[in-house]
Amino acid sequence: MFSHSFENDDHLNELRERLCRDSRDSLQLLRNFQDNPICSVVLDEANRCITVLWKQYATKAQFRYIHENLLTLICKHRVCKILGDDTALPTVPSEDRVWIIDKWFPRAVECGLRFAASKRPASYFGKIAVGHIQSAAPVGIECRSFEQLYEAKEWLDTVAAG
């Protein structure tokens, strides 16, 4: 099972330092990972699921800080499902998409993430970005996108936690 290495701790510390010098939104993210101007995160331990509601665009540092903390939750609580409300996500820059695909997904799968479902973004570029990420998901994780959040949740409720 994956455990956070010193390298990952160094990466998180570097991201924290960057965010400290960043915007007010970044400072609020540092103060409250679960509810801030960029996203809200809810852990449902009983169903081994994390729900992420994106509220606005995330800078590279914000995006990676959020995902590193999601990874910590996935590993610590043996989360196997993630539900995303991507409605307000305007886009994900290509550099961050590649990072998710090449760096984050493999670690999340190693920790036990098996299913990801999301409500499609409202913006055209958000839809393209999320579609690219989901289509490049590695073996071991099944990703689906839906027009409505309740459809994504219903699908996650049908898959085995295994």
Feature names for model-found ranges:
Residues 2-162:
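Amphipathic, Lys/Arg-enriched alpha-helical "gate/interface" segment within cytosolic domains
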